[in-house]
A protein has these predicted regions:
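Short beta->alpha connector loops at strand-helix junctions that form conserved
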Residues: 28-29, 51, 72-73, 89-100, ...
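Positively charged N-terminal leader segments that act as targeting/secretion signals
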Residues: 328-341, 345-354, 359, 363-367, ...
Length: 388
């Protein structure tokens, strides 16, 4: 049997049980670098399931038996994927297990902030029934929601917001206006255009060098003074020091944050002193239903990968190998390369950038496109996600 390492606290029992049925399983007591290296090498581990643990280049370099890392969820910023690729380790993730739960959390934030829910609850608990006379909340109908990053989560948020009669805009330079219009979404041609118009701004991006700190002082000054910022992506996408100043100085009205730059936050984190911020502990996607689905898919993905079968989803750097294998066969190249042409691939960094076609093509045209792109990937070494 294949040998798999789980890390305390691990995934849901539905996933653990599936792995135990198919693999010899070991448990690491924590996710510290030295602990993982020791456990992997002592037990000749081939596959590992990760959640929030930091998986470093040193781990990949020090553990020659490790072949697969299966991330429980979509985000892989805790894993040095480039190092994994360098050492022949495939990284797997689950991009569609919890997107509905995250979208629901976005709408909860919109409603809670618009109706001053937390303040109203506090007032009633402390005998201030007259809060209803001194506080006038806002409706969300006819308000404008800007979605920054129109991936699975963003598209699901758009559907939910439309049901509340909100005006939905999106900033995503890789999706044309006509495609957005088909979803009932108005395209913001620039981020600034969207920020100027929005009453609520929700960030749905992966953390990359390009997105780190993209919401900062300049962006907050562009936003309406009545606007609310929502972040359910990754904490460092938002410059927290700049956000604190914007909120303290009433440059924007509020924020709702499921993620922070440092988790958990330090006791002296300035944002914690403000009453116009709603916090949740990075569990926007952690509904019971989503956790069950993600745990099961993570286990299935890992088992298939260890058995040499086609896997549910690879992180994009590792798809280079798959594309390269398809270079000699046009249709195989198309099958391997095109899923990430219009799925999550957003930018290519190898000294130059290029926009990738998202439009589905068929037949020989698709095969040619796939083969051409596969050959291009063979010559370039780093492809990364931008949007969720």
């Amino acid at each position: 049997k294949h040998r798999v390492l789980l890390i305390e606290p691990t995934i849901q029992p539905v996933g653990v049980d599936l792995i135990k049925e198919n693999c010899e399983t070991f448990m690491a007591p924590d996710g510290k670098e030295e602990t993982l290296i020791r456990c992997i090498n002592e037990n000749q581990i081939e596959g590992m399931v990760t959640r929030v643990e930091t998986i470093t280049r040193k781990i990949f370099k020090s553990c020659p038996t490790l072949k697969i890392v299966a991330q429980h969820g979509v985000g892989v910023d805790n894993i040095d994927v480039a190092a994994a690729t360098d050492h022949g380790v495939k990284v797997l993730n689950i991009p569609d297990g919890n997107y509905t739960s995250v979208a629901e959390h976005v709408m909860m934030f919109v409603l809670a902030s618009s109706r001053t829910l937390l303040q109203a609850d506090y007032a009633v608990r402390h005998g201030n029934w007259k809060f209803r006379e001194t506080n006038i909340p806002h409706a969300v109908a006819e308000k404008t929601l800007l979605i920054v990053g129109l991936g699975r989560i963003g598209r699901t948020v758009a559907k939910m917001a439309a049901a509340f009669d909100m005006n939905v805009m999106a900033y995503d330079p890789f999706i044309p206006a006509n495609k957005m219009a088909e979803l009932g979404i108005k395209k913001a041609e620039t981020l600034d255009d969207g920020l100027k118009a929005a009453d609520y701004v929700t960030i749905q991006l992966h953390l990359t060098p390009e997105t780190r700190g993209m919401m900062s002082t300049e962006q907050f000054k562009i936003m309406k003074k009545s606007a609310v910022l929502l972040n359910l992506s990754r904490g460092p996408v938002v410059d927290q020091a700049a956000l604190y100043e914007a909120l303290k100085n009433h440059e924007i009205a509020g924020a709702a944050l499921d993620v922070l730059a440092s988790e958990p936050p330090a006791a002296d984190e300035p944002l914690l002193t403000l009453d116009n911020v709603i916090f949740t502990p990075h569990f926007g996607g952690d509904t019971y239903e989503a956790k069950q689905t993600v745990s099961r898919k993570t286990a299935e993905n890992l088992i298939k990968a260890l058995d040499g079968e086609d896997t549910y989803n690879w992180v994009i750097e590792n798809k280079i190998e798959a594309a390269e294998k398809g270079c000699g066969d046009k249709r195989k190249g198309a099958a391997q390369a095109t899923p990430f042409l219009y799925e999550k691939a957003r930018s290519l960094r190898a000294g130059k950038r290029c926009f990738l076609a998202r439009r589905r093509q068929k037949g020989r045209g698709l095969a040619a496109l796939g083969a051409h792109f596969a050959q291009f990937i063979c010559k370039n070494t780093l492809l990364h996600f931008l949007l969720i």
